[in-house]
Amino acid sequence: MRIILLGAPGAGKGTQANFIMDKYGIPQISTGDMLRAAIKAGTELGKQAKAVIDAGQLVSDEIILGLIKERIAQDDCEKGFLLDGFPRTIPQADGLKEMGVDVDYVIEFDVADDVIVERMAGRRAHLPSGRTYHVVYNPPKVEGKDDVTGEDLVVRDDDKEETVRARLGVYHEQTAPLINYYGKEAEAGNTKYLKFDGTKQVAEVSADIEKALA
């Protein structure tokens, strides 16, 4: 099961990604994690990426696609994988297709901008693990503390309103066109496109996903 998640920052992708990973036993492939791992391991692509980053440039699609190709060839991706944060642009989606990566499902989480801004303000993060909570929608068992370690949760700079609105602007400009792109791919029978109402409760959205993927 090869899945791409689409949705604005704060639409609930991360929470549902964890659900899908646990439920179906497939790894989440995050381009950020992949880049860090390749740089740390000193692979050929990692060295190229490091040189670009050190020069203050953005890593090219070519390098990212190369990393994805290496990553999905690993044993844990045998049953499939979940792509989160990639593709972000039409050229990246084309690159994935040209590489021969078939996508079984494209899942979109639909949430209005104002709802996202309100949501982000309530987010709390456990930085060492990357686990995230929300004071209203997905509270920790103990207020302000991580469920697993009991350590303090923090509000990330990313979750402040002006930052959120700026990121939403970028999303609408760059990534929203992928909704049309994958809609057409689905019409052509190349993938299945699933759209979920991201304003519903976390458990409800998870149940909807499970039903759709059954």
Curated annotation (Swiss-Prot):
Positions contributing to ATP binding: 10-15, 123, 132-133, 200
Keyword Kinase listed: yes
Binding site for AMP: 31, 36, 57-59, 85-88, 92, 156, 167
InterPro entries according to UniProt: Adenyl_kin_sub (IPR006259), Adenylat/UMP-CMP_kin (IPR000850), Adenylat_kinase_CS (IPR033690), Adenylate_kinase_lid-dom (IPR007862), P-loop_NTPase (IPR027417)
Entry keyword set: ATP-binding, Cytoplasm, Kinase, Nucleotide biosynthesis, Nucleotide-binding, Transferase
EC number: 2.7.4.3
UniProt catalytic activity: AMP + ATP = 2 ADP
Pathway note: Purine metabolism; AMP biosynthesis via salvage pathway; AMP from ADP: step 1/1
GO annotations of cellular component type: cytoplasm
EC top class named in words: transferase
GO biological process: AMP salvage
Residue ranges of the region described as LID: 122-159
One Pfam assignment: ADK
Gene3D superfamilies assigned: P-loop containing nucleotide triphosphate hydrolases
Localization, UniProt: Cytoplasm
Major localization listed first in the record, in broad terms: cytoplasm
UniProt region (NMP), positions on chain: 30-59
Coiled-coil boundaries: none
CDD domains according to UniProt: ADK
HAMAP family per UniProt: Adenylate_kinase_Adk (MF_00235)
NCBIfam families: adk, PRK00279.1-1, PRK00279.1-2, PRK00279.1-3
Biological role stated in the UniProt entry: Catalyzes the reversible transfer of the terminal phosphate group between ATP and AMP. Plays an important role in cellular energy homeostasis and in adenine nucleotide metabolism.
Domain notes: Consists of three domains, a large central CORE domain and two small peripheral domains, NMPbind and LID, which undergo movements during catalysis. The LID domain closes over the site of phosphoryl transfer upon ATP binding. Assembling and dissambling the active center during each catalytic cycle provides an effective means to prevent ATP hydrolysis.
Family the entry assigns: Belongs to the adenylate kinase family.
Protein name: Adenylate kinase
Organism name: Vibrio campbellii (strain ATCC BAA-1116)
Gene: adk
